[in-house]
């Protein structure tokens, strides 16, 4: 990471591999949550068909499965068919995350520009023998921009933001390897990943297993992950008061999906995450958080395919609560429409969060724990987006996605004073997949 003039990015502990994606659920990291490779089986509801149909599904079954399978990014939990992939798959994805500039009337000092992040992902997955598969995932993030340093009072007494006033540059590389074993009624996977950047290093290990009922109508999934992270902040013009800190995180998940009918499927899951170590943000002036953090999330999903419309209704809900006093609700509605041009899925997501116990708009430092990070405040947010996926041939698939995220204090379900640094952003991505024997 290179700091041009004054300070570096804001930092928060990252989520582990078994933890569902955080956007709209957990206090979002300064970087956008890692969006896992969009490959067959990743981030979909496990759908099971009678064994006699597994070999050559009808066109209708293929379209039903395609429409039912999509889960929102923030709720992706891996699910796989009980056989290794029939083909080797190579995928490349580019994403762009761009935050709006801070409003001029909310700025006291520094740059109004905020983060732009370019994310490039490459993955390769293929079968090994009759019962195994292996996958390699590589992700590179390049980030530039500025971030809030602290919140103070302007001359008229209103809360305003003191920004870094500098362009921050950061590059992160993450490499992960997953091996998976398949048997008649289930599968199990083991993933090892390592992430490295100038001031942050993390190594994680994740294990998951899924198994089916005798009639293949119900699938249970459980997973566990552990991550060991090390933070070594880089000193800038604005001083950082720590040299090295560590964070350990463990996460567990259990869920079940049930085929309700030929055209409907439902899912419910429970996730528990525990972190211990350094959880404060060293690049903020007034930030001293507890050294433990417990989080629990209950997620549900429902898919209903309409044969006449050749489309499916997608409904997802998640409730989240943690030991810092934060809880939140996330509701997403989507409509996956099959057409001659592919699968088009517009979606709308609503999110509302209660502020942490120790959050203050202008943080007072005379208490054991304090923070003025807007990500810990009370607010509501709306995301509107759409994704389009099209098979160009039997070997090539392309997917495009774009979404707009807007947050406001008044949109939330909970009381709390508005944080002046609330963020709005655009996110776009393009994904190309190649399958071959």
Question: Model-derived features: where do they sit?
Answer:
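Outer-membrane beta-barrel "beta-signal"
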Residues: 422-437
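Residues on the lipid-exposed face of transmembrane beta-strands in outer-membrane beta-barrel proteins
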Residues: 122-126, 177-181, 207-211, 254-258, ...
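Repeated loop/turn-to-beta-strand initiation elements of outer-membrane beta-barrel proteins
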Residues: 132-134, 185-190, 215-220, 262-268, ...
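Transmembrane beta-strands of outer-membrane beta-barrel pores
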Residues: 94-100, 140-144, 183-185, 192-198, ...
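Outer-membrane beta-barrel translocator domains and adjoining extracellular loop/strand segments
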Residues: 101-109, 147-153, 191-193, 200-208, ...
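Outer-membrane beta-barrel translocator/channel fold
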Residues: 103-104, 139-175, 219-277, 347-389
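Extracellular loop and loop/strand-boundary signature of outer-membrane beta-barrel proteins
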Residues: 105-111, 160-165, 191-195, 206-208, ...
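Membrane-embedded beta-strand positions of outer-membrane beta-barrel proteins
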Residues: 90-94, 136-138, 190, 220-224, ...
């Amino acid at each position: 990471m290179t700091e041009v003039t004054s300070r570096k990015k804001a930092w928060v502990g990252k989520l582990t591999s078994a933890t569902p994606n955080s956007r709209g659920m957990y206090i979002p990291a300064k970087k956008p949550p890692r969006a896992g490779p969009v490959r067959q089986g990743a981030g979909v509801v496990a759908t099971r068909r009678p064994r006699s149909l597994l070999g050559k599904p009808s066109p209708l079954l293929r379209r039903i499965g395609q429409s039912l399978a999509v889960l929102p990014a923030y709720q992706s939990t891996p699910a796989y068919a009980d056989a290794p992939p029939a083909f080797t798959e190579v995928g490349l994805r580019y994403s762009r995350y761009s935050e709006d500039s801070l409003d001029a009337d909310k700025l006291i000092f520094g740059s109004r520009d905020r983060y732009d992040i370019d994310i490039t992902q490459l993955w390769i997955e293929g079968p090994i023998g009759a019962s195994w598969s292996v996958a390699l995932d590589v992700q590179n993030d390049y980030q530039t921009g500025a971030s809030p340093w602290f919140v103070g009072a302007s001359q008229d007494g209103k809360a305003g933001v003191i920004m870094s006033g500098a362009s921050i540059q950061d590059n992160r590389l993450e490499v992960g390897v997953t091996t998976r074993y398949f048997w008649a009624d289930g599968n199990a996977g083991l993933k090892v990943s390592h992430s490295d950047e100038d001031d942050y290093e993390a190594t994680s290990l994740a294990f998951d297993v899924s198994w089916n009922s005798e009639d293949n109508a119900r699938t249970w999934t459980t997973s566990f992950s552990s991550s060991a992270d090390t933070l070594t902040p880089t000193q800038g013009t604005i001083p950082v008061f720590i040299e090295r800190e560590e964070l350990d995180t463990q996460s567990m998940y259990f869920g079940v999906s049930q085929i309700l009918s030929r055209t409907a499927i439902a899912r419910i899951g429970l996730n528990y995450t525990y972190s211990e170590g350094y959880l404060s943000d060293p690049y903020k002036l007034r930030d001293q958080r507890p050294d433990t953090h417990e989080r629990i999330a209950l997620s549900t999903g429902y898919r209903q395919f309409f044969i006449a419309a050749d489309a499916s209704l997608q409904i997802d809900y998640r409730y989240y609560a943690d030991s810092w006093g934060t809880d939140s609700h996330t509701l997403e509605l989507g409509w996956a429409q099959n057409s001659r041009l592919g699968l088009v899925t517009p979606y709308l997501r609503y999110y509302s969060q209660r502020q942490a116990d120790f959050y203050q708009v202008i943080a007072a430092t005379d208490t054991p724990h304090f923070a003025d990070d807007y990500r810990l405040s009370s607010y509501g947010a709306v995301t509107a987006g759409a994704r389009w996926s099209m098979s160009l041939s039997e070997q090539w698939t392309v997917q495009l996605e774009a979404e707009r995220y807007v947050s406001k204090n008044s949109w939330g379900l909970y009381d709390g004073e508005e944080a002046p640094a609330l963020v709005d952003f655009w996110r776009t991505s393009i994904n190309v997949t190649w399958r071959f024997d």
